[in-house]
Amino acid sequence: PHPLDEVNLDYRVTGGARAGSDDEVMITACRKEIVEDYTAVMELAGLRAVIVDVGLFAMERGYEFVAATLGESLEGRAIALMDFGDVSTRLDLFVDGAVIYGRDQNFGGRILTENIRSRYGIDYREAEALKRTGDLPQNYEADLLAPFREAMAREAARGMEFCLSARHGVEHVDALLICGGCAQIPDMAPLIESHVGVPTLIADPFAPGSGIRASKLVARYAPLMIKAAGLAVRGAT
C-alpha cells in the first residue's frame, strides 16, 4: 500500500530448493518513518542501531530459549505463547519452533493502570509505579486487581478460541506459555489454565536449561525478557 521509496525491504531464504522447486524466500517490509523513529530514539540515548529487527522474529528466537527449559521434546507439539503487553496482547502458535498462527488482541496492562489512576486520583506515572510495587489501599485487590485478573483470563480463553478455530491444521494446543508484565501478577497462570483448559506456565527464558545466565535484577523480569533475549542473539545464530 506504500510506494517502494517509502519502505525498507529485507529478505531471508527460509527453505532450500527441492528437486524441481524454487527457494522459499521471506520478504519483510516496513515504512521508513517507523524505522527512523526507532533509530532516532537510540541516537538520543547515545546508541547507534546496527540492526532494526522485527518483533515477531525476535520472539521466535527468544521462544527457543523458553522451549529449552521445558525439559521434554516438543517435536510435533503445538505450544501457544501469549504476550500480555501494555496496550495489546499477542498470541503466537508454535509448531516445531516456527510460528504458524498469530493474532493481536486489544487488551493490555494499561487498562489496570488507568483504573488505578482514576480510582485513586493520581497521575499515570504514579499509578504505574504503584501497580508494580503493590503499595496500594487494601481495597485494591478486591475492587481493581481481581476483576482485571478475570478479564485477563477471559482474554486468554478468547484468544485460544480464535486460535483453534483458524484453519492451520492444529486441532489442539498442548501448552500455553504466558509472558509480559501482566504474567507476573500472582497466581495468574493457574487462573488462566482454569479458563482455557490447557496446561499454562509462565515463560522464563532464563530458567535452567536455557543456557542463559542472567543477573538477579534481569531475572526478576524474566517474563518480559523473551523478545530481548531474541534480539540479543540476532546474527549470532
Give each language-model segment a name.
Residues 148, 171-201, 206:
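Glycine-rich phosphate-binding loops at beta-strand->alpha-helix junctions
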Residues 1-67, 175, 205-211, 224:
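Active-site neighborhood for divalent-cation/phosphate handling
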Residues 35-61, 98-138:
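Glycine-rich phosphate-binding loop plus the immediately following alpha-helix
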Residues 26, 78-82, 177:
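Conserved beta-strand elements of the Class I
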Residues 114, 118-119, 127-174, 182:
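Adenine-nucleotide phosphate-binding core of ATP-dependent small-molecule kinases
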